[in-house]
Amino acid sequence: MAQPSIGQKIVVDVPSTTANLGPGFDCLGAALDLNNRFAMRRIEGDSGRFELIIEGNEGSHLRGGPNNLIYRAAQRVWKAAGLEPVGLEAKVRLAVPPARGLGSSASAIVAGLVGANALVGEPLSKEKLLELAIDIEGHPDNVVPSLLGGLCLTAKAASQRWRVVRCVWINSVKVVVAIPSIRLSTSEARRAMPKDIPISDAVENLGALTLLLQGLRTGNGDLITDGMHDRLHEPYRWPLIKGGLDVRDAALNAGAWGCAISGAGPSVLALCPEDKGQAVSQAMVKAWEAEGVASRAPLLSIQTGGSHWQPQIEDE
């Protein structure tokens, strides 16, 4: 695509993501068909100028300025391409609020990278954008599926190079994500975890991960059930989520194959067959309602296309 001129807008669509999927702590994540939209354009003026416009109530507390995560990511693109930074405006419509465990920071990073790259003629490859995204976020399990889409397993090889494996997620396995009104910051969730874990817990997680990946590939519910167990972070984070265990149990009783904390929480994810989706959704919302917590629980599929941009024809 041709490089947009100053004032011309592009639209970047970035999927929400779920990470730490089951036993895949800090390595396994998936893109959900719940997109965040970023309308972006170059603006005249100071190269450090960043204007942020939030549409709707989600993320209304976010602010612009040069320290905003979108703009910081954009600056990394321009630096890597050997270009001078430019002023930027972003009009943002979030599908889910921040601090819910659905990759809001990853969405901001990927939007900044993809949008900034597009606005200067796409000098960087998707592989380079992926490298920058992981470096900015500090871990790969949200930013990789946010950029690439699908189910992604990411690990650092002995060579210190990040390796990404696109795994198969059969379409018959659906996702219900119960998104509560309460917040939980990633930093708070990280602090709850111990610095060291028993080797038996690590071994159990490795085995569960292989079962889960096979279950998602084949649609085998029994394998998903046996694989959706974690010993590395969930035992320490469930107590931080008001009513979280009740929500999990309600989903399982309604027919879900397995449940997990989405990301660092507080959202709770359930995997189920499509014909159980509505029952699982209603049960999870009702369980949180019993704790005085408002929530919604959409039935979702995996988004396979990842992030993409296009010229904006008219204001939306």
Curated annotation (Swiss-Prot):
- Catalytic reactions on record: L-homoserine + ATP = O-phospho-L-homoserine + ADP + H(+)
Q: Which residues participate in ATP binding? A: P97, P98, A99, R100, G101, L102, G103, S104, S105, A106, S107
Q: Which Gene3D superfamilies match?
A: 3.30.230.10, GHMP kinase, C-terminal domain
Group of enzyme by EC? transferase
Q: Which cellular components does GO assign to this protein?
A: cytoplasm
Keyword set includes Phosphoprotein = no
One GO BP annotation is: threonine biosynthetic process
* Localization, UniProt: Cytoplasm
Care to name a GO molecular-function term for this sequence?
homoserine kinase activity
* A Pfam family: GHMP_kinases_C
Q: In which pathway does it act?
A: Amino-acid biosynthesis; L-threonine biosynthesis; L-threonine from L-aspartate: step 4/5
Biological function: Catalyzes the ATP-dependent phosphorylation of L-homoserine to L-homoserine phosphate.
Q: Which family does it belong to?
A: Belongs to the GHMP kinase family. Homoserine kinase subfamily.
In Swiss-Prot or TrEMBL terms, this protein is called Homoserine kinase
Organism encoding this protein: Prochlorococcus marinus (strain MIT 9303)
